[in-house]
Amino acid sequence: MKFIDEALIRIEAGDGGNGCVSFRREKFIPKGGPDGGDGGDGGDVYLIADENLNTLIDYRFEKSFAAERGENGRSSDCTGRRGKDITLRVPVGTRAIDNDTKEVLGDLTKHGTKMLVAKGGYHGLGNARFKSSVNRAPRQKTNGTPGEKRDLQLELMLLADVGMLGLPNAGKSTFIRAVSAAKPKVADYPFTTLVPSLGVTRVDTSRSFVIADIPGLIEGASEGAGLGVRFLKHLERCHVLIHLVDIAPIDESDPADNIAIIEGELFQYSEKLANKPRWLVFNKIDILSDEEATARAKNIMQRLGGEDDYYLISAATGKNVDVLCRDIMDFIEENPRQEQEKIDAQEVKFKWDDYHQEQLSEQVFTEDDQEEDDWDDWSEDDEEGVEIIYKP
C-alpha cells in the first residue's frame, strides 16, 4: 500500500435543530397551551487512533465528512432527535491541525485515543420554553446554532525510539536490515529509500526498540533539494537520533563536510529537533583497516572540534553493531519517554440552564401587552406570526 503521511480534509459538525411553535389541540380543549418541543443537538466529528492503519491514503480520495443535523422540535413537547456523530479512523501517531489557523488540535499517540475535532451545534428552544404567567400563548422560538466547520490537516508522524539521519547511501537501510527484520530496498545509487520505514530491534528476549529510517538529506534540502525535509517530522518523537556517516565516501567527499551539511539542514528545519540527543556513527569501516578507520575518525572529530564520542561500525558485516544496539537500549531505558500530560477535558462553558435562561430573559412582557384571552390558542390568521429569536 502506498505510504501517505499528509491529507487535507473538510469536516462539518451537524447544525442544531430548530425549536417548534405549536399549541395543544384536543377534543374539548380547543385552546390548549404551548407544546412546541426543542430541537436536537447536531452530531460531532471525532478522530480515533487505530493501530491497524499505517497510512492516510483513505483521506486522499474522500475529503469531505459531515455529521448529521439535529432534527427540529415537534408538537406535543417532542424533542428533535440528536444528529449522529461520525468517527474517522486514523493511524496511531496522527496529528490534527486546523488548516486556517495552524492550531494543533492534538496528537493521537495511543491506540484507541479519541479526539473531538468539530463540535455539533446546540438545539433551539420550542415555544413551550417561553411560557410564563404573563405570556401564556408564546409565539417565540429559537433556531439551533451552526456546527463547527473546518479544514483539517492530518499529518502522520511515525512513533519510533530511534531515528536514522544521514546523506543518501550512508548505509541507513543496510543498518536497519542488519538489526531488525525490516527489509528496505538497498542499492548503490542515491535515494534508494523514498518513504520512511520502521524496524524493531531486539536486544534480548525482553528488550527491544523501534528504529525509523527516512530518505537521505542533501545540501539544500530545507529549500526543497532532493526529497526535501518533509520526512524529518517522523523523527520528532524519537528518543535519540543516529547520525550515520560514510567514513570513506565513494565520491571522495569530506566526511566532516557531510556531517556539517546534515547538522545545518536539521537546524534549518527545527532547532528543537537539532537539539535532540544525536550520536555520531561512522559506517563502512570494513573497507578500511582498523587502524586507518580509527585514525580517520579521530581526524574528522578534531576538525569538527568535537569530543571522541562516536562509534565505528560496519552495517554490512555487523561489526560493532551489537555494541551500538545495546548502548541505544540502555540509553532509552535510562531516559524514558516523557508521557504527555493528561489534560482533563475542559469543562464545557456552555451550560444548558444558563443558555435557556438567557434566551428566555431576552423577552420581557407586561400585563398591558396581553389580551384577556392571551392564553388562548394561536390563530393562523394572526398578522404578527411567529417570532424567531436569534442569538446575537
Swiss-Prot record:
Cofactor needs: Mg(2+)
SUPFAM superfamilies assigned: Obg GTP-binding protein N-terminal domain, P-loop containing nucleoside triphosphate hydrolases
Residue span(s) of domain Obg: 1-159
Assigned keywords, A-Z: Cytoplasm, GTP-binding, Hydrolase, Magnesium, Metal-binding, Nucleotide-binding
NCBIfam families: Obg_CgtA (TIGR02729), PRK12297.1 (NF008955), PRK12299.1 (NF008956)
UniProt cross-references to InterPro entries, sorted A to Z: G_OBG (IPR031167), GTP-bd (IPR006073), GTP-bd_Obg/CgtA (IPR014100), GTP1-OBG_CS (IPR006074), GTP1_OBG_dom (IPR006169), GTP1_OBG_dom_sf (IPR036726), OBG_GTPase (IPR045086), P-loop_NTPase (IPR027417)
Pfam family, any one: MMR_HSR1
GO cellular component: cytoplasm
Residues covered by the OBG-type G domain: 160-333
Region (Disordered): 361-392
Sequence ranges of Acidic residues compositional bias: 365-386
Residues reported in the UniProt entry to bind GTP: 166-173, 191-195, 213-216, 283-286, 314-316
Domain of life: Bacteria
A molecular function GO annotation: GTP binding
Entry's EC annotation: 3.6.5.-
Known partners and oligomeric status: Monomer.
Main location: cytoplasm
Binding site for Mg(2+): S173, T193
Name listed for the protein in its UniProt record: GTPase Obg
